[in-house]
Amino acid sequence: MRGPGVSGLTTGTSQTVAPVCRDCVWWQSRGNRTASKQRWIERAEEEWGEWGSIYLDEHGRLLGSLQYGPSYLFPRAADLPAGPASDDAALVTCLYLLRGATGWVEKSLLLAAIGESRDRGTTALEAFAYRYPEHETQEERFLVHRTVFPRDFLDEFGFATLRSQGRVELCRLELGGLQAVEEGRRAKVLRVVQDAFTPTPIPLPRP
């Protein structure tokens, strides 16, 4: 059994994700052409490596998963409002959360994508976002629509709007300013990136 926390999404862990995600090729397809998930996975692992992350609890149960990789692996991005994604960027395509997952799950998964992409020397990370009306429910924002991110969620990580069309935006996070880390050391990746996006506490005045 795998330990709790974030692990890479590969052929070996792909059966851990939710059943609806295992054969989904929405991002990998375009128009009337439907991609083969297995052939896509083989290409992604040969040209990129791990193509996402999973988050497991202490009992080895899935809490969430995130898919990402070089933008050219996701042709659907060209058809989305505000698309296509940039050629030099990795693209975060979808986030699947199970009901009851805490807010730290989606943040940990995105932090892993930021850290791993930076570790590979990628210029930037991009994602499609949607500006939800104020007071929209958490379920609507994270559990109903899984292929676009709430815009204010990406704000927390410093994503900037590259293009917009209506309420949909293509957002970009430049990775050049983040400290590089040794490849494969996921815990250190997460720690370095988390530190980069955690504000320094303001010292309280002494009484």
Regions found by a protein language model. Name each.
Residues Q67-Y68, L95, A127-Y132:
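Short loop/turn segments at strand-loop or loop-helix junctions that form parts
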Residues T147, F157-G158, G166-R206:
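C-terminal "cap" of GNAT-fold acetyltransferases
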Residues M1-E47, G52-R61, K188-V189, P199-P207:
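Short amphipathic alpha-helix that is part of the acyltransferase structural core
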Residues S117-F142:
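Conserved GNAT acetyl-CoA-binding A-motif
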